[in-house]
């Protein structure tokens, strides 16, 4: 059995790490490179960086900080933000990123997933899915351009359908960003995760809702996710990664101990 992964998420805007609640009202957390080094030193298995306004601004992630991060950490990291072409992805990977993640550009052009997977290998291609539960319809819908609340829109896709499409297109991993839970720290949406797990054949990463160590345990034990991504509990030092991993190991979760 592959070890489960603990993945801090760093949302980047204007060259700094920020964090919001339900993708809104972002506050500045700090500088990118020191935070990345801190999480690597604490025992994170990998890091994810989202340039949250790149797609809505029509630009690609700023590559300068990607190179600086690569110089100070020795764990894998993934970068997302406005990647629309093989050339965009190649440049980010050349600066030291191990994976690239696409989200809104994949919704605009699903063939992008296949082209990137064919060029760089499926193990390098992550698809992020921003999913919102609509109380009125009782369904989960995929949202696009979520980094800019003035441009965020609900797409035609129901989440489970889009999960299956991106796998067919060549996604090597899926990060499920559960918007209702984002930053609230009330736990991951286990109901949704279980539904997605049933149709997801590639590694599945849960994102949105972690507030306690027990929430991570529930995601691994009850929804069988491959990794758990979190931000605010790490940024605000509510949970220490080393202590979290020791707790999970004590609960029988297969995990890499620092």
UniProtKB/Swiss-Prot annotation:
Molecular function per GO: imidazoleglycerol-phosphate synthase activity; lyase activity
Gene3D superfamilies: Aldolase class I (3.20.20.70)
Top-rank EC class of the record's enzyme: lyase
CC annotations in GO: cytoplasm
Catalysed conversion reaction: 5-[(5-phospho-1-deoxy-D-ribulos-1-ylimino)methylamino]-1-(5-phospho-beta-D-ribosyl)imidazole-4-carboxamide + L-glutamine = D-erythro-1-(imidazol-4-yl)glycerol 3-phosphate + 5-amino-1-(5-phospho-beta-D-ribosyl)imidazole-4-carboxamide + L-glutamate + H(+)
Protein's pathway: Amino-acid biosynthesis; L-histidine biosynthesis; L-histidine from 5-phospho-alpha-D-ribose 1-diphosphate: step 5/9
UniProt keyword Lyase, yes or no: yes
Cell compartments where the protein resides: Cytoplasm
Main localisation: cytoplasm
Keyword Lyase: yes
Keywords: Amino-acid biosynthesis, Cytoplasm, Histidine biosynthesis, Lyase
Record-level GO BP terms: L-histidine biosynthetic process
Spans traversing the lipid bilayer: none
Active site: 11, 130
Subunit structure, interactors included: Heterodimer of HisH and HisF.
Functional description taken from the UniProt entry: IGPS catalyzes the conversion of PRFAR and glutamine to IGP, AICAR and glutamate. The HisF subunit catalyzes the cyclization activity that produces IGP and AICAR from PRFAR using the ammonia provided by the HisH subunit.
Family: Belongs to the HisA/HisF family.
Name of the protein this chain belongs to: Imidazole glycerol phosphate synthase subunit HisF
Native source organism of the sequence: Salmonella schwarzengrund (strain CVM19633)
């Amino acid at each position: 059995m592959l070890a489960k992964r603990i993945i801090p998420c760093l949302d980047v805007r204007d060259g700094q790490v920020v964090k919001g609640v339900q993708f809104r009202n972002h506050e500045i957390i700090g500088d990118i490179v020191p935070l990345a080094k801190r999480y690597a030193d604490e025992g994170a298995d990998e890091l994810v960086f989202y340039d949250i306004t790149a797609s809505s601004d029509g630009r690609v992630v700023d590559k300068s900080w990607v190179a600086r991060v690569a110089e100070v950490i020795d764990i894998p990291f993934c970068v997302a933000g406005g990647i629309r072409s093989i050339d965009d992805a190649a440049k980010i990977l050349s600066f030291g990123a191990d994976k690239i993640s696409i989200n809104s550009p994949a919704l605009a052009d699903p063939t992008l997933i296949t082209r990137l997977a064919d060029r760089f290998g499926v193990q390098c291609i992550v698809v992020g899915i921003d999913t919102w539960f609509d109380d009125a319809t009782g369904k989960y819908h995929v949202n696009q351009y979520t980094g800019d609340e003035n441009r965020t829109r609900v797409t035609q896709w129901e989440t489970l359908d889009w999960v299956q499409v991106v796998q067919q297109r060549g996604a090597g991993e899926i990060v499920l960003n559960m918007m209702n839970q984002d930053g609230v720290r009330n736990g991951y949406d286990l109901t949704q995760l279980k539904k997605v797990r049933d149709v997801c054949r590639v590694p599945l990463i849960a994102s949105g809702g972690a507030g306690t160590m027990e929430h991570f345990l529930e995601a691994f034990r009850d929804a069988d996710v491959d990794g758990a991504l979190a931000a605010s509990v790490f940024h605000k030092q509510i949970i220490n990664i080393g202590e979290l991993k020791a707790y999970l190991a004590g609960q029988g979760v297969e995990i890499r101990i620092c």
